[in-house]
A protein has these predicted regions:
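Glycine-rich phosphate-binding P-loop
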Residues: 1-12, 42
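Helix-rich effector regions associated with P-loop NTPase G domains
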Residues: 14-167
Length: 167
């Protein structure tokens, strides 16, 4: 749920513009609720550069970074690789792929396997990986592949006392 959706829910109507993509809210907008509370809807802020490449990739996978400024084939290929690693069963089930036939394939080859299985071909029999990329990204964002977590919280250190401790 985005900020504008929350403002609309609390404000009791559709006062702030909402779309299923980032960057819709361009200016500040005050919304008054039915009980007189004023809420301020504002554009989001995204760091121009991330300390960790994985953070940027994960944001792009989810659509938090506009596809228009990205190479979607490269992005979808990386997503295929990540899904094959962290959610192999969901990935293979969605695209009807045999996991044993995918062992050792590059990220791009995994995207090609999706294109081939879905029958995405250009004239001359060349795989339409651009179309496959769009499908993989859309289906991941719509949770059609499954409800998959890209990041896990850091492991909590054990608070169990060790054998020599007096508790």
């Amino acid at each position: 749920v985005g900020k504008s959706s929350l403002v609309n829910k609390l404000g009791g109507g559709k006062k702030a513009k909402v779309e299923d993509r980032p960057g819709v809210t361009l200016t500040k907008q005050w919304v008054t609720t039915n009980i007189g509370i004023e809420l301020l809807d504002m554009p989001g802020v995204l760091w121009p550069k991330f300390d960790d490449r994985t953070t940027g990739e994960n944001l792009a996978f989810t659509g938090a970074i506009r596809d228009a400024i990205l190479d979607t084939e490269e992005l979808a290929a990386k997503l295929c690789g990540k899904l094959y690693t962290i959610a192999q069963a969901d990935f293979c089930t969605r695209y009807k792929l045999d996991p044993s036939s995918l062992e050792g394939l590059s990220d791009y080859d995994l995207l090609c396997a999706v294109a081939k299985k879905r029958g995405f071909l250009l004239s001359g029999g060349e795989l339409n990986t651009e179309r496959a990329a769009g499908i993989v990204l859309d289906e991941f964002r719509e949770a059609k592949i499954g409800r998959i977590t890209l990041e896990l919280p850091p492991k909590k250190e054990s608070t169990k006392p060790s054998e020599g401790d007096n508790a």
